[in-house]
Amino acid sequence: MKPAPWSLNLSFARACLAALRCGRVVLLAVVPLFVQAQGEAQPLPVLTLSVLQFGTPHWELDHLKRHGLDKANGFDLKVRLVADLPASRLALSSGSVDGAVSDLLWAQARYEAGTLYRYLPFSSQIGEVLVNDSSPIRTLADLRGKRIGVAGGPDGLGWQLLQQAAAGQGIDLAREATVQYAAPPLLSQALRRGQVDALLTFWHFSARLRGEGGVRIAFGLADLIGTLGLDPDLPVLGYLFPQAWAIEHDDLLQRFSRALRETKDQLASQRDLWQEIRPLMRADNDAVFAALHDSFVEGIPQPLDAARIAALHRLLLLTGAEPEKLMPAALFQSEP
C-alpha cells in the first residue's frame, strides 16, 4: 500500500525543519571540509636549491626549513646537496635546480657570456689574510718578497681585491711575491707548517683556523675594500637564479627573499638557535664554533638599494669588468 501524498510532504517538511534547526552545525562541519579541499587543490610552489652539504648557505637553509619559514611564507623549500661547487654550478646551469649560491664575479662572467642570472644577496664575507702569531707581517708592504698562499685561484675575488689594494700602494704582488694556488685545506696545512708566510683564504676556513689558535688576521678583505673607497658590507656572495625563471616566478622569489631575511634576523639575534646547526658546521670545539658563528653573523648583508647596487658595479669595474658589459641593476634582487 502506497503512502498518502500528504504523508510524504509532511516527512519532507519535518526533514527541512530539522536541517534548519541544526544548520549551524551543518555549516561548521562543511566549511572546514571546503577549506581543506581548497588547500589540497592548491599545493605550495616548490623552490629547489643546490648547496654544498657542509657549505655555509646550508646553515641558514637548514634553519629556514627546520623552523617552517618556507611554509609560513607560502612555498616549499627543497634542498639538493652536492659534493662541491662545480657540481652545484652544473645543477644550476643544467636547470635541474632553480637556484644555487655563487660569487659576484662568476655571475658577471656568465652575464658576459650571455647567460643571465638574478642575484639575491647571501653574504658580504670574502676572506682574510692570515699569518702565524709570530709573523712580522702587518701591512701590505710586508708582503713583498713573501710566500703567499691563495685559495680560489688567480681569478678569485679575494686575490683580485688584494692585488688592487696593493697596487694602490705601488706594490705588484704578482711580481714581488711568490704566489701559490691550492685548495683551502692544503693551504691551511701549509701555513701551519711554515710553507707559506701568509694565507689568503675564504672566511669560513679563516674562522676555523683562528678558532684552533696559533694564527691571526693580518688584514681582512672587507677592510681592503674600504681602502678602495667602497662599502665593506657589499654582498659578494649570492643566490643565483636564471633570469627567465626569476621573471616567471617573481612571486616565489619574493617569498623566498622574505623567508631568508627572517632567517638571517633570527640567526643574528638568537645564538641558541645555532646549536641545531652545529652538526653542519663541523665545529670540533667551542672556539671554532664561536668563530664560525661570529663571522657568519658579521657577513649578513644589508638589503640592496640603488646606492649599494652602484657600489657593486664599482667593485666589478675594479676587478676587470668592462663598463659596457656590467650586469644591469635589474639583475640584482631587492628585498620586498
Segments (PLM) and residue ranges:
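N-terminal secretory signal peptides that target proteins for export/translocation
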Residues: 1-18
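Bacterial N-terminal signal peptides
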Residues: 22-33
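Boundary at the C-terminal end of the N-terminal hydrophobic targeting segment
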Residues: 37-41
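Short, glycine-/small- and polar/acidic-enriched structural segments
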Residues: 42-172, 180-181, 197-203, 218
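Short, solvent-exposed loop/beta-turn-alpha elements that line the ligand-binding surface or hinge
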Residues: 72, 222-232, 297-306
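Pocket-lining segment of extracytoplasmic ligand-binding domains
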Residues: 104-105, 185-277
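Secondary-structure end/capping motifs
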Residues: 246-321
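Conserved C-terminal helix/tail region of periplasmic/extracytoplasmic solute-binding proteins
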Residues: 313-336
